[in-house]
């Protein structure tokens, strides 16, 4: 069980690193604007602070009024785009 958890955490970390590298590459090619990346980072940060992960597949809701928005969902305290 510990091995599976470690593999899952490392896989998620690699996915985040890959996603960030691809976003920087697209920004360098002027495909996306740097303001768009800043907005995505702000949404992820807000979500990671306010996300309460629920069990049994229930949707993720933030503490109080904050929620992931704009197609973002909270998984493992991160906002992920679906």
UniProtKB/Swiss-Prot annotation:
InterPro entries: Hwtx-2-like (IPR012625). The keyword Iron does not apply. PROSITE patterns: HWTX_2. It is found in: Secreted. Expressed by the venom gland. This toxin causes paralysis and death to sheep blowflies. It does not target insect sodium channels. One of its GO terms (cellular component) is extracellular region. Coiled coil: none annotated. This is U1-theraphotoxin-Ct1b. It comes from Coremiocnemis tropix. Contains 3 disulfide bonds. Two different connectivities are observed in similar proteins (C1-C3, C2-C5, C4-C6 or C1-C4, C2-C5, C3-C6). GO terms for molecular function: calcium channel regulator activity; toxin activity. Residues 24-44 form a propeptide. Keywords: Calcium channel impairing toxin, Disulfide bond, Ion channel impairing toxin, Neurotoxin, Secreted, Signal, Toxin, Voltage-gated calcium channel impairing toxin. No effect of the synthetic peptide are observed on voltage-gated sodium channels from the American cockroach Periplanata americana or the German cockroach Blattella germanica. Pfam families: Toxin_20. Belongs to the neurotoxin 12 (Hwtx-2) family. 03 (juruin) subfamily. Residues 1-23 form the signal peptide.
């Amino acid at each position: 069980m510990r091995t599976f958890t470690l593999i899952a955490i490392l896989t998620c970390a690699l996915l985040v690193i890959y996603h960030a590298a691809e976003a920087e590459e697209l920004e360098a090619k002027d495909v996306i604007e740097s303001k768009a990346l800043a907005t995505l980072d702000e949404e992820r940060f807000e979500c990671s602070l306010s996300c309460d992960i629920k069990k049994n597949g229930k949707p993720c809701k933030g503490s109080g009024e904050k929620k992931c928005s704009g197609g973002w969902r909270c998984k493992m305290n991160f906002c992920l785009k679906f």
